Amino acid sequence: MADETTNGAAAPADQQQQPVMPTLKIMAQFIRDMSFENIAAQKGVQGEGQPDIQVQVNLDAKKRTVEKQFEVAIKLNINAKTKESGDMIFGLELDYAGIFFIDNVPDEQMHPFLLIECPRMIFPFVRRIVSDVTRDGGFPPLNLDQIDFVALYRQEIARRAAAQQAAPSAEV
């Protein structure tokens, strides 16, 4: 009889002492938009050796109409050019989104949470899509390096702060 449950009188005190852990669930993920152009095949561009590959990454996050749900998107723009002449070999644009249920994250931490943790969770799928599309397009698979989303977030915050300081103040 010593294993019987209590009537719950001690439960509220225990809950106050325990920190509430954030909840993050991926509800869905999908390709919102994608474009791949094999320019080398269209124009007959010949390139020997490793191409010069440029990858641009943009992140976007917005609240959905459903409570505690957010949509986070990774937008990639990848261009491969020959090192010798700079001729375009291929171009890939990918807009990949995830729908997330997020709970127990303080408001002041939500912005970095959305632009760091959520992209980190869906990035492996983005990497695979890029690899598959470049391979299916007739090139060796392009395996993207891991993206440091913390550094990307900090760069964006610094860029916004610099832009805000550079903007002339409106005096009336």
From Swiss-Prot:
UniProt-listed Gene3D superfamilies: SecB-like
Protein origin, superkingdom: Bacteria
Cell compartment(s), UniProt: Cytoplasm
Keywords noted in UniProt: Chaperone, Cytoplasm, Protein transport, Translocation, Transport
One Pfam short name: SecB
Coiled-coil residue spans: none
GO MF annotation list: unfolded protein binding
GO cellular component: cytoplasm
GO biological processes: protein folding; protein tetramerization; protein transport
Subunit annotation: Homotetramer, a dimer of dimers. One homotetramer interacts with 1 SecA dimer.
Function, as annotated: One of the proteins required for the normal export of preproteins out of the cell cytoplasm. It is a molecular chaperone that binds to a subset of precursor proteins, maintaining them in a translocation-competent state. It also specifically binds to its receptor SecA.
HAMAP family, per the entry: SecB
Family label: Belongs to the SecB family.
Protein name: Protein-export protein SecB
Origin species: Dinoroseobacter shibae (strain DSM 16493 / NCIMB 14021 / DFL 12)
Gene that encodes it: secB
